[in-house]
């Protein structure tokens, strides 16, 4: 085989290097701007979380517990990747086993769309007492609703900062 050297080889080499450099340096900017799809999913999750909370709050005599905490946002990520979808999904799957509501299936479906990478399944310890189960469901539902409010604010403020 004959080796060709000349201006076309240098240009091709430069083009390949420049393309890789541009791709690696523009990627973080693209991640900071939430796509319309992610924002629509989070808006839908926010609406569904309100429906779930309203449904759960109809149970009289159940109070929120300080014993349960839903991990909401990942501290080391930027919007839209900062929603801790795998952990939230695990909690809602647990709630679905205790109280099978159709809205929970919808929420899990939307959360699946937000999981950008394979994450280990979070293990949730479930209370065994019936009343404590109701407190668990109410507490996690309330925290999930607050989380979606926070996530949507995070997305919209991140989008505004990216445009300025």
UniProtKB/Swiss-Prot annotation:
One of its GO terms (biological process) is immune system process. Residues 1-23 form the signal peptide. It comes from the Eukaryota. Keywords: Cytokine, Glycoprotein, Immunity, Secreted, Signal. Pfam families: IL31. Activates STAT3 and possibly STAT1 and STAT5 through the IL31 heterodimeric receptor composed of IL31RA and OSMR. May function in skin immunity. Enhances myeloid progenitor cell survival in vitro. Induces RETNLA and serum amyloid A protein expression in macrophages. One of its GO terms (molecular function) is cytokine receptor binding. Glycans are attached at residues 67, 100. Its main location: secreted. This is Interleukin-31. Induction: Up-regulated in skin homing T-cells of patients with atopic dermatitis (AD) and in activated circulating T-cells. Up-regulated in lesional biopsies of patients with allergic contact dermatitis (ACD). It is found in: Secreted. Detected at low levels in testis, bone marrow, skeletal muscle, kidney, colon, thymus, small intestine and trachea. InterPro entries: IL-31. One of its GO terms (cellular component) is extracellular space.
């Amino acid at each position: 085989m004959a080796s060709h050297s000349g201006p076309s080889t240098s240009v091709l080499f430069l083009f390949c290097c420049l393309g890789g450099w541009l791709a690696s340096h523009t990627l973080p900017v693209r991640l900071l701007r939430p796509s319309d799809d992610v924002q629509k999913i989070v808006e839908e999750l926010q609406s569904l979380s309100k429906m779930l909370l309203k449904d759960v709050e109809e149970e009289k005599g159940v109070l929120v517990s300080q014993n349960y905490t839903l991990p909401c946002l990942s501290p080391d990520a930027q919007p839209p990747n900062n929603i801790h979808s795998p952990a939230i999904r695990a909690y809602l799957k647990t709630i679905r086993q205790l109280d099978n509501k159709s809205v929970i299936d919808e929420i899990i479906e939307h959360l699946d769309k937000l999981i950008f990478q394979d994450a280990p399944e979070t293990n949730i310890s479930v209370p065994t007492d019936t009343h404590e189960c109701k407190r668990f469901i109410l507490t996690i539902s309330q925290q999930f609703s607050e989380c979606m409010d926070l996530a949507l604010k995070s997305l919209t403020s991140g989008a505004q900062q990216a445009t300025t």
